[in-house]
Amino acid sequence: MAEQPAGGQGAGDSRDSRGDRDSRGRRGDGGRGGRDRDGDKSNYLERVVAINRVSKVVKGGRRFSFTALVIVGDGNGMVGVGYGKAKEVPAAIAKGVEEARKGFFRVPLIRGTITHPVQGEAAAGVVLLRPASPGTGVIAGGAARAVLECAGVHDILAKSLGSDNAINVVHATVAALKLLQRPEEVAARRGLPIEDVAPAGMLKARRESDALASAAAAREAAAQ
């Protein structure tokens, strides 16, 4: 009887090693939007909005580097914007992420939308944000959408009224979000009851949202 070639076992080993390589080569869930470099950062959403190559003329010629505009948020009202620069793209993104995390700010939300219409401006960028009813979704362009999704906004109408440059749009969107105020803040500033400042529908949605959050916290406490 002729001996079988050793290729059968080798093919199996090749498949096993290929499987190991595939398992090692998989990136964290979310691709560019959810890199999982360590356990802490896996809790945050990351969006790379723009990557540009820049050059600097020196005596010996040109030196090239990369810049990255990154949005980071927890998907629950916290968001930040960072701008990183380095000789390599991954390093530029990492610097942008760190800067964004240092610049976190809170966005007032009620049931997944903003509290009132607002317009933000930055350089030539102008962005108008309007609240939307549940189920509307995020109606916005790519740059503004990245900021809103990382902030945890689920229903909103956004329109760019100025420059289409991604950097200007991002900073205008951030400027608009920073202008948002809670009904309690407006009532306290005017010296009026909150019922005289905020619409009844907003107050009802606020109460329902608080009730859902309290119920979720109670369930988590009971599970522990």
UniProtKB/Swiss-Prot annotation:
Keyword Protease set for record: no
Single GO MF descriptor: structural constituent of ribosome
Gene3D superfamilies for the chain: 3.30.160.20, 3.30.230.10
Biased composition (Basic and acidic residues): 13-40
Function: With S4 and S12 plays an important role in translational accuracy.
Known partners and oligomeric status: Part of the 30S ribosomal subunit. Contacts proteins S4 and S8.
Family of the protein in this entry: Belongs to the universal ribosomal protein uS5 family.
PANTHER family named among the record's database cross-references: MITOCHONDRIAL RIBOSOMAL PROTEIN S5
Name of protein: Small ribosomal subunit protein uS5
Organism: Mycolicibacterium paratuberculosis (strain ATCC BAA-968 / K-10) (Mycobacterium paratuberculosis)
Upper classification of the organism: Bacteria, Bacillati, Actinomycetota, Actinomycetes, Mycobacteriales
